[in-house]
Amino acid sequence: MKDIFNFFEKPKDPLSFSAIRISLASPDKIRQWSHGEVKKPETINYRTFKPERDGLFCAKIFGPVKDYECNCGKYKRMKHRGVVCEKCGVEVIQSKVRRERLGHITLATPVAHIWFLKSLPSRIGNLLDITLKDLEKVLYCESYIVIDPKETTFQRGELLSEDRYQKALDEFGDDAFSAGMGGEAVLGLLRGVGPASKEHGEGIPGLANELRAEMKEATSDAKRKKIAKRLKVVEAFVASGNKPEWMMLEVIPVIPPDLRPLVPLDGGRFATSDLNDLYRRVINRNNRLKRLQELNAPDIIIRNEKRMLQEAVDALFDNGRRGKTITGPNKRPLKSLSDMLKGKQGRFRQNLLGKRVDYSGRSVIVVGPELKLHQCGLPKIMALELFKPFIYNKLEEKGYVTTIKSAKKMVEKERPEVWDILDEVIREHPVLLNRAPTLHRLGIQAFEPVLIEGKAIQLHPLVCTAFNADFDGDQMAVHVPLSIEAQMEARVLMMSTNNILSPAHGKPIIVPSQDIVLGIYYMTRERAFARGEGKVFASPEEVRAAYDQGEVDLQAKVWVRMDGKRVETTVGRVLLYDIVPRRLSFDAINKVMDKKQLQGLIDLTYRLCGEKETVLLADRVRSMGYGNATRAGISIALDNMVIPRKKVDLLERATREVDDIQAQYTEGLITIGERYNKVIDIWAQVTEEVAQEMMGEIGTETAVGTGKDGKREERRQPSFNPIYIMADSGARGSAQQIRQLAGMRGLMAKPSGEIIETPITANFREGLNVLQYFISTHGARKGLADTALKTANSGYLTRRLVDVAQDAIITEYDCGAMDGITLGALVEGGEIIEPMGERILGRVALDDILDAFSGNVLVKANEEIDEGRVKLIENSGIDKVKIRSVLTCQARRGICVECYGRDLARGRKVNIGEAVGVIAAQSIGEPGTQLTMRTFHIGGAASRRAEQSTIENRNAGLIKFNNVSVAKKHDGTLIVMNRNGEIIVTDDQGRERERYGVVYGAKLLVREGQKVEANQLLAEWDPYSMPIITEVAGRVKYGDLVDGVTISEQVDEITGLARKAVIASKDPDARPRISIKDEEGKTKKLANSDADARYMLPEGANLVVNDGDEVDAGDVIAKMPRETTKTKDITGGLPRVAELFEARKPKEHAVISEIDGVVAFGKDTKGKRKVVITPEVDGKLRPDLAKEYLIGKGKHISVHTGDRVRAGEALMDGAANPHDILRVLGEKELARWLVDEVQEVYRLQGVKINDKHIETIVRQMLRRVRIVDVGDTEFLADEQVEKFAFEEENERVLKAGGRAAQGEPLLLGITKASLSTESFISASSFQETTKVLTEAAISGKVDYLRGLKENVIMGRLVPAGTGLGAYKHLDIEVETPVDAVEEAEEALAVGAEE
């Protein structure tokens, strides 16, 4: 490995090295780099502006200020190149060496490098086993430290105060032991680091052996952890070959002067880089210290000077890390070397990862309705500027000019020849258009420029969705790809016509929107009594002729013979069929075409006819849509907002219901929380009903006309109300917004997210009164504030995702994985949310998929499941399929083609080299920003579903109960007494049609084996509270329910009634409970076990029964109020997604069972309840294998004695903890849970993302294992290692006949995972730069430049896509353009003749 500083000699080709290593620099190394010592703090002479000799800008050390000219002016020009001037000592050479030559400062005393001292954990402290506090005392000259105790009783590394040191000198004499303070002492200690006893060897390797031995003997966990930490640092030194004393600085490098320039301003002042100030401080203090040492000054003065020097060096390396921040004259902290690297403005992110580009311009965009999909309009003036070099070249080639200078003049005069040449230059030369923020790869696309007058760029309307652009003043940037390779990539990979499908979900992203949809929708609608209704035509051509002649209307219903069949259709649809590819059947468009249908049409065309046809179709649809939208002449008038007639009655009814509930509350029948929830529900329901009435009235109309027999006739038909048309077609607006215009605005949310219980009953058409307007402003403002915040949050989420997934690249065809995941339909609450077909499309089958009945192979193992095969699978009635997945891919680096499956943006299997990690990150991050930007459109109107409190079946069939235990009340009703019971509806053959989970405390309205009709009520429950129910009849006895201690009687101010609620008590032994006694006062036993009928009450439970009441089995004895619902919005969303990907532990997470078994309660300890789960083996309970869990007092335990629980099931209420799921259920279950949870957030917003993207991120989060048992491997206990490194090391040890290490899978959040990547360059450019670099330097890390980020930073091509190693040797041959043009012209001529 070459020394990196040879970089500074001549610019190297970035491809000439394959890895880069970082390590500590020794003092000799620094002197070797240096071109001379900087002795004086002076910079330049302010009169002559010449650099001072031996100063910070010295020309002798760093090189001449002007090219080939020495300082005193004796030697000038090229002919003296390489001479060293004997007068001023300057070498005659180019001045740019001042950007690469280093100097050095020799320090009078060694100084600690602050990174290794203060970056936690302190490396120097760890190595010497001294605490940071003590270390600082020594370094900043406050205490002495024993370096060599010799014969005395001191320990090596012991601290002595001034008094103690003097006493010891008196006691033992001067030579009896050596102690010191300041840098020299620490340097001495570091030089002598080694084991306590000689048996382990010498120096650092000896120390490592000793620590390993100690670790084997260590008894306590804490001690083992401490040793492991120290061992980690020691091992790093052993492995890297760094010497510990190099963490102390004896020589400091001075960076080249042109990297810390001094610029004269007008008025004789100078602007300088902060580094010069920091270096000046160091030199001043160093020189002063040298002088004091020569003068033999008193100890105390020298000590003070040493401390100041240490502080000055600290500030130079990392200002503000320790002590006071050093500020400049303007009270601004000085920017130290570390600050140059850190943060968004640091070297990494500002200059290495993002650079400014030449050949670019930006301008406002306007719509270009007549452009083809692959074109964009480029203003002539812009094109002239961007393509200048090409124009100069052509002008010279054609002989118009002889020199570049004259070419320049010609272009400036804008002569006619220039415009001709410009036309020729830009023909077929694609340009890239980019709209900021670029949230996914479709934010940059390539187009062929068309020259236009004016100053605005014209954009094709169909690509607006991808860019998220609109024409209200958006700007876009244009970039010119210069090289042939770049042009080729732009054309093949980035052309807008090659990006029809979205990489996020694989559906078209080039879809008609707004006016286009409106026009197509309008032309495919049918209008009653239109001119020419009922006519019959022999062919589509006849229809067209009749329409052109004005014989039939666009929306008239007619009969036409199509492909030999008579079809009933409308004129508009026949005209639309004219532009659709012939492969598509007429049925595909013989319906009202709204936005969804149009997306389906484009999708279908893409699958059946390919890319080219799709592009042509898109352009034709665009033109036809715009044309018909114009002809439709749709406008909005006040009268179009139809307020439903029934609104008044509905509102009156709701007010009455609310009054009833208020009355119930006043009588004390319900709690304040239930009242609030019920009121909210009533209003939510009424708002819905008003909206439905309104949509009903606005959505249909009665058409009057003359029937066939000439009589007046009325017909109902879908309305032609413009507002309805816009919403129904999907062009603009939603039912939600129309509701606010013409229905009622409904419930609003407070900024805290609670719902205000008085809704806004008015709509915008009627107008709001002052109070209503005021309530509205709440929501609207919150929307705007949220938008600003969430955009930033979302961007940050995307950045973290990209960082963690940037090295997930497709690297091989097949990893040979034998494992996969099982996918079925996604069902929630008995409804199929996502059918299985959608989830398995484009994946690769793991095993043969067989038809359940015939046993035929539908899909072979390792075949892609495409649209056709999905149909086969769905028709065969298979409900679960095993597929290959990124999660189980065995590729050592990256991912293999088979496990990934289809590249969604191309609709075929993924290519090798595709950067699927980045695509996944963009697909997840992009909608985050979209959603955040879209919150305020509804103006904070609260959207909330009425709580589900019943189960209805959708299909008729037979009822079957699965794991349902019930209590029968005396009136015969059945109450469900456990939590994980299910009601299953089966058909006559006994096949399961649907399945519903039933809640604890629900009232069953059906019995086992009962026949039910469709949509029958099966069960109902109280949605607002969780009941605690007794299983036996008897008399209530309170236990530990003491007023004011464990229960409080709260008297309601409004109703004056008292209600008892359990409160948290100070007494740790109090166990509030209710027991059920029999006549003799003995506690009753539960029916199915020998446990007592005792019910523990969690905090917050409301008591429903009094002491001594008689109760029946199935009665409610206490209620737990459920939280009042907050509005569901992506606010729950974005932070939720971040929380999931960061793998945070929820605050109040549920304890889950680690085994299957039967629940029992043990003795309480320390005020916590003990739940014991006993497993069954072969039908027998095995108490020896039981697991115990302690659950905090006041938490609601959701299992009961005798319940059977499965592993991974929650024992109490609370959020799931992903780390628990991983530990108990394993990686696949965790991955499934994460995918479902993330998807749920996006689904609420109607955003589609393919599962495989989330899986890709989860794979990156699960890359590591934690070592539990080291075996004979090189690992340390509790160390986190990459999975594959772990497997390789184990293989090595097993081959040698040793014992393998044991590890447990580890789930890292995305930030942690990014920081722990193998590449230190990538990690340091992400976050915590200094920490990452400190660690990397000590362990002498090597970065093999495998990820994308490291390569961008090193200025190489990324190892993905066309930059992949496999494609490196391909060269592109260019035909001379002249031949190509001639060939093309010949071909055209031949084509024309044919």
UniProtKB/Swiss-Prot annotation:
CDD domains from the UniProt entry: RNAP_beta'_C, RNAP_beta'_N
Signal peptide: none
InterPro entries attached to this UniProt entry: DNA-dir_RpoC_beta_prime (IPR045867), DNA-dir_RpoC_beta_prime_bact (IPR012754), RNA_pol_asu (IPR000722), RNA_pol_N (IPR006592), RNA_pol_Rpb1_1 (IPR007080), RNA_pol_Rpb1_3 (IPR007066), RNA_pol_Rpb1_3_sf (IPR042102), RNA_pol_Rpb1_4 (IPR007083)
Uppermost EC category: transferase
Required cofactor(s): Mg(2+); Zn(2+)
Keywords: DNA-directed RNA polymerase, Magnesium, Metal-binding, Nucleotidyltransferase, Transcription, Transferase, Zinc
The enzyme's E.C. designation: 2.7.7.6
Pfam families (UniProt xref): RNA_pol_Rpb1_1, RNA_pol_Rpb1_2, RNA_pol_Rpb1_3, RNA_pol_Rpb1_4, RNA_pol_Rpb1_5
SMART domains: RPOLA_N (SM00663)
Protein purpose: DNA-dependent RNA polymerase catalyzes the transcription of DNA into RNA using the four ribonucleoside triphosphates as substrates.
Protein name, UniProt field: DNA-directed RNA polymerase subunit beta'
Origin species: Anaeromyxobacter dehalogenans (strain 2CP-C)
Primary gene name: rpoC
